């Protein structure tokens, strides 16, 4: 079943129907209730395995349904990052982030950092505040072991990972930024559900 060109799901306990884009119950006993969003990062298996070497993987199976078989992200055209702050959403289109991979932003009263990795073709989002201090981030010359550029904060010169939000060297080494709720999404799908939401670059 589709709603605004997006899949609907149902729960087995109440048979309520849910919209996966917004996490809201669309119909049924739980109509109007919202699920809690969890941050979702799309990254390469190499990046993930290096960060979490003990990761276990469920065996896959080939599907004969119309969904087909996922063969990896080959393009970012039409994609963006949906960032949710205090129940409000903002879209950061990947096309705009290609031109400006590090964005120091403020949205819904919160200082936000959005970082796009050209190599990984994905983005992450973090709070820029740390222990009462507001940090401003820039692209660093240094790279991680996978060739991805690292970040540098302008206040202490510490070097940060775009993927984990952790300071890997400098005065703030070991510190970690608070991860925001975000997930990659088709730009058109975001606009269909969040018609009045702000869009970075517009």
Residue map of PLM features:
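Mid-to-C-terminal functional-domain signal that highlights helix-capping/loop sites
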Residues: 1-202
């Amino acid at each position: 079943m589709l709603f605004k060109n997006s899949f609907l799901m149902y729960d087995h306990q109440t048979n309520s129907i849910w919209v996966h884009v917004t996490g809201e119950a669309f119909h049924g006993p739980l109509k109007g209730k919202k699920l809690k969003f969890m941050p979702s990062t799309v990254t390469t298996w190499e990046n993930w395995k290096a960060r979490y070497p003990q990761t276990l993987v469920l065996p896959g199976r080939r599907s004969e349904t119309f969904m087909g078989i996922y063969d990896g992200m080959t393009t970012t055209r039409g994609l963006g990052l949906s960032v949710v702050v205090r129940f409000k959403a903002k879209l950061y289109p990947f096309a705009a982030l290609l031109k400006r991979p590090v964005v120091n932003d403020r949205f819904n009263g919160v200082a936000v950092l959005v970082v796009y990795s050209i190599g990984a073709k994905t983005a992450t989002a973090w709070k820029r505040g740390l222990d009462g201090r507001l940090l401003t981030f820039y692209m660093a010359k240094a790279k991680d072991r996978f060739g991805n550029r690292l970040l540098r904060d302008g206040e202490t010169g510490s070097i940060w990972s775009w993927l984990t939000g952790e300071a890997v060297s400098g005065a703030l080494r070991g510190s970690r930024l608070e991860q925001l709720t975000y997930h990659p999404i088709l730009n058109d799908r975001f606009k269909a559900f969040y018609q009045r939401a702000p869009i970075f670059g517009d």
